């Protein structure tokens, strides 16, 4: 199905270009007896590269079409897509309307922090990956939303600020690679749960 959609979405100029390149391939074959082997190889390469780029374009378009079909199957639909496009806000669990970008960023902080806190610090590779993901989501959140008046008074914002402050306070005293004690983990998880209630 994706291939048919890809062909329907295929650019007419690319088809024209491909049709235009076919005679070049045939002309190269006709001139085969008159040219040296270097030019024969060049002509052959033109044909192969032209055909392969044509097929790659069709395949890529097919994959894009398949991905868009999967998104439609996931329940977004055309109406949902238009609503998402033109409505910058989203209703939270508590019924408030907040910017979608804020909610996405805050939810990512909650998710990555929770995963990081649940990882076993003795499994260094997994622990580092989850900690790095949490740091990155916090950086993104702070760079976009710290001090923003549209969200600064929200409960979720206050709870996430508490989480970030608790982490900063602990690591400034204990050092950047110190393991979090259970009481700090519990406090942070409680704040994350409270923040999630308002997202």
Swiss-Prot record:
GO biological process, any: photosystem II repair
Phenotypic consequence of gene deletion: A high chlorophyll fluorescence mutant. Impaired PSII function, maximum photochemical efficiency of PSII was decreased, about 25% PSII in thylakoids; severely reduced growth, decreased chlorophyll content. Inefficient processing of the D1 precursor to the mature form.
Keywords from the named record: Chloroplast, Plastid, Thylakoid, Transit peptide
Gene Ontology CC: one annotated term: chloroplast thylakoid lumen
Any Pfam family: PSII_Pbs27
Annotated compartments: Plastid, Chloroplast thylakoid lumen
InterPro entries named in the record: PSII_Psb27 (IPR025585), PSII_Psb27_sf (IPR038450)
Quaternary structure annotation from Swiss-Prot or TrEMBL: Interacts with the C-terminus of both the precursor and mature form of D1.
HAMAP family: PSII_Psb27 (MF_01481)
Stated role: Required, but not essential, for D1 (psbA) precursor processing and thus correct photosystem II assembly (PSII).
Family indicated by similarity: Belongs to the Psb27 family.
Protein name as annotated: Photosystem II D1 precursor processing protein PSB27-H2, chloroplastic
Species in which this protein is naturally found: Arabidopsis thaliana (Mouse-ear cress)
Taxon lineage: Eukaryota, Viridiplantae, Streptophyta, Embryophyta, Tracheophyta
């Amino acid at each position: 199905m994706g291939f048919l959609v890809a062909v329907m979405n295929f650019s007419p100029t690319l088809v024209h270009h491909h049709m235009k390149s076919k005679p070049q391939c045939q002309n190269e074959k006709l001139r085969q007896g008159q040219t040296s082997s270097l030019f024969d190889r060049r002509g052959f390469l033109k044909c192969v590269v032209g055909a392969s780029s044509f097929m790659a374009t069709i395949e890529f378009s097919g994959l894009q079409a398949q991905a868009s079909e999967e998104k439609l199957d996931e329940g977004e639909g055309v109406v949902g897509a238009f609503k998402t496009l033109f409505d910058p806000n989203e209703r939270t669990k508590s019924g408030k309307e907040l910017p979608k970008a804020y909610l996405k960023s805050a939810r990512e902080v909650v998710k990555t922090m929770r995963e990081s806190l649940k990882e076993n610090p003795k499994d260094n590779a997994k622990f580092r990956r989850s900690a790095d993901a949490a740091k990155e989501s916090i950086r993104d959140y702070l760079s976009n939303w710290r001090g923003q008046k549209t969200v600064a008074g929200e409960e979720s914002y206050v709870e996430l600020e508490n989480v970030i402050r608790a982490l900063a306070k602990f690591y400034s005293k204990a050092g950047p690679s110190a393991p979090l004690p259970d009481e700090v983990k519990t406090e942070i998880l409680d704040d994350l749960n409270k923040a999630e209630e308002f997202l």
